[in-house]
Design a protein with these regions (language model features):
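Multi-bladed beta-propeller domains
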Residues: 16-33, 61-78, 105-122, 138, ...
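Beta-strand C-termini and the immediately following turn/loop, strongest in propeller blades
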Residues: 2-8, 17, 39, 44-51, ...
Length: 581
């Protein structure tokens, strides 16, 4: 297997040979490496990206050796999908300034361009026999899933305009037999699909000549993803459900039409992969255990050392009444201090994401300094079903701020926090909500930290990627030229001059998701309005892989929050772990 692990504070690629229990480090780059895979010939694939997130795929033998270009002739750009076929064919999705492209070939050979488009798209998978590619568009679009032949001919299109639809991957090749050999049987492509229908997520399959068939016995009330089991036996699928900030696993036997729970420790499963021998490997965490690899059979895996934090606070789940249902908040309070406490809302990113029962170094550091911490899964968060995720009744951003305001009032009424000592801290979309809340309700928040935020919606759209432009167009109901009032109403820059509390803005010079140009536009409004603020620039992209940058942000954020919250002592040495993302 190959995986991403820690190397002196950086993300790097490693191998692990289960038969010998040994591994090695594959990459060693100054600013880290994140993406990796392993192909049918056991070659390690890794994405050689620059600090702005653009690059090319390279390969290296599993046991070591020189790095080589994975496919020649592929444009330099951002990764947008990798599919490694059992037949030896590979497909690469790349986003470049010219648009999105899919390139097909043999490892080390030339990549033939199968698709080129300016639309938002991602390569999902390649059928085992190499005869079909699945390309994902926005789940709500007319081309939610496009099936292509190797020459680029469109074979089928699945629309998501009525019911959101997305592809999850082709079934693996059947196990080899003496008569058939190791190659996949041609023409037996079976694509796993998820479709949102009547407030639930329904698993289904698509096959040539048969079309899409949903499985009525396999549906879920909250967000769920799935992967095929490899190896012998009938078609089986491993499903991972996110529900109310925690995870559950199931196995679906498609022949028997049976759904069986898979026992797991309580907490959050960040990823789960079935192994060929029927075992399941997961990345598991909870509030006091850092993420680590686990084998549900108990087999040894890399990164299984147990690092459980000492008890650093009291944890509880609170539910606050709201117009579209109760709002769920994870609350952690100091165990050795009496309430009410200074209170910090850690606002999660997304918007299609959620806070969960998982280790967060910021929670540990803030609670250790005497603060209570609230992590609210406002409307728009995943893990609570389609209706909750789509609830924007009070407008983009303002709906989420309204839920933060309700949770704040509830926590103060319960005596957990206290008036005059309530702060906000968020990254990306969480940074956006921090800025919007600080500007629209300046009377409620006493300090704020916005890390790599969306700060000016119109400028962000102009300088963003096609994928994020498509997201904004769906979220706002059009482009800034088509619905300018909607963008202005949701933009933190509209309200920036109203901020009255201390504000720290952390931004990245190479950020493609929350571009520096829109942060500069927001800062100009702050300066014009005479709003006092502090600024920290990073020479990185949106998702930095260097722990030194994350540690610097944690230090600066904790000290800034400590100064802005009365009776919250400034920590002398914050937790030296990765920044919340």
């Amino acid at each position: 297997m190959v995986y991403t692990g820690d190397a002196d504070g950086r993300c790097e690629i490693f191998t692990w040979d289960r038969s010998t229990g040994t591994g090695r480090q594959v990459t060693d780059r100054p600013h880290g490496t994140l993406l990796c895979a392993i192909d049918a010939d056991e070659a390690v694939w890794w994405f050689d990206e620059d600090r702005g997130g653009s690059g090319r795929w390279r390969t290296q033998p599993f046991d070591g050796g020189p790095d080589r270009p994975a496919l020649t002739g592929v444009p330099y750009g951002r990764p947008a999908g990798l599919a490694l076929g059992a037949s030896g064919t590979v497909a690469v999705g790349i986003r470049s300034p010219e648009g999105f492209g899919v390139h097909l070939g043999r490892p080390g050979g030339a990549g033939a361009t199968v698709l080129r488009t300016t639309d938002s798209a991602t390569l999902c998978d390649l059928a085992p026999d190499g005869r079909l590619l699945a390309v994902s568009g926005p789940a709500h679009s007319a081309r939610a899933v496009t099936l292509l032949a190797p020459d680029g001919t469109t074979v089928a299109v699945l629309s998501g305009t009525v019911e959101r639809t997305w592809a999850l991957g082709f079934a693996p090749a059947p196990a080899p037999t003496p008569a058939r050999g190791p190659l996949p049987v041609p023409g037996r492509a079976l694509l796993l699909v998820m479709r949102e229908r009547a407030g639930r997520y329904h698993l289904g399959t698509w096959a040539p000549g048969r079309g899409l068939e949903l499985l009525p016995w396999c549906s879920f009330a909250t967000e769920t993803t799935a992967r095929w089991y490899p190896g012998p036996g009938g078609p089986r699928v491993l499903l991972r459900q996110d529900r109310h900030g925690r995870s559950r696993l199931f196995t679906a036997d498609l022949d028997r039409r049976e759904l069986t729970p898979v026992p797991t420790p309580e907490g959050s499963i960040l990823d789960a992969a079935p192994a060929a021998d029927g075992d399941v490997h997961v990345i598991w965490t909870d509030a006091v255990n850092v993420p680590r690899a686990l084998s549900l059979s108990g087999a040894p895996l890399p990164g299984q050392s147990r690092w459980r934090l000492p008890r650093f606070g009291h944890r509880q789940d609170l539910w606050t009444p709201g117009p579209d249902g109760p709002v769920h908040t994870f609350v952690t309070t100091p165990a050795d201090r009496s309430a009410p406490h200074p209170l910090v809302f850690l606002v999660h990113g997304g918007p299609a994401d959620h806070d969960r029962d998982a280790y967060d170094p910021m929670v540990q550091a803030l609670v250790g300094s005497g603060c209570a911490v609230a992590r609210t899964n406002y409307r728009g968060s995943t893990g609570y079903g389609p209706r909750w995720r789509a609830a924007y009744s009070e407008g983009v951003g303002h709906t989420q701020v309204a839920d933060l305001v309700r949770a704040r009032a509830d926590l103060l009424e319960r005596g957990i926090g206290r008036e005059g000592a309530v702060g906000l801290c968020g990254t990306s979309w969480g940074g956006y909500l921090t800025l919007l809340a600080m500007g629209t309700r300046p009377d409620l928040w006493d300090v704020g930290v916005a890390v790599k935020p969306l700060a000016d919606c119109v400028t962000a759209f102009r300088h963003s990627t096609p994928a994020l432009q498509a997201l904004d167009t769906a979220l706002f109901g059009g482009t800034p030229d088509e619905v300018p009032d909607a963008y202005a109403h949701a933009s933190p820059s509209t309200y920036a001059a109203a901020i009255r509390s201390p504000l720290l803005v952390v931004a990245a010079r190479r950020d493609a998701k929350c571009p520096p140009e829109q942060v500069e536009a927001y800062l100009a409004v702050l300066r014009a309005g005479g709003v006092a603020h502090e600024l920290m620039w990073l020479d990185s992209g949106h998702d930095g892989y260097d722990g030194a940058d994350h540690l610097a942000v944690i230090r600066r954020s904790l000290r800034f929050l400590g100064r802005g919250l009365p009776a919250a002592p400034v920590p002398a040495e914050p937790s030296p772990h990765a920044e919340r993302r």
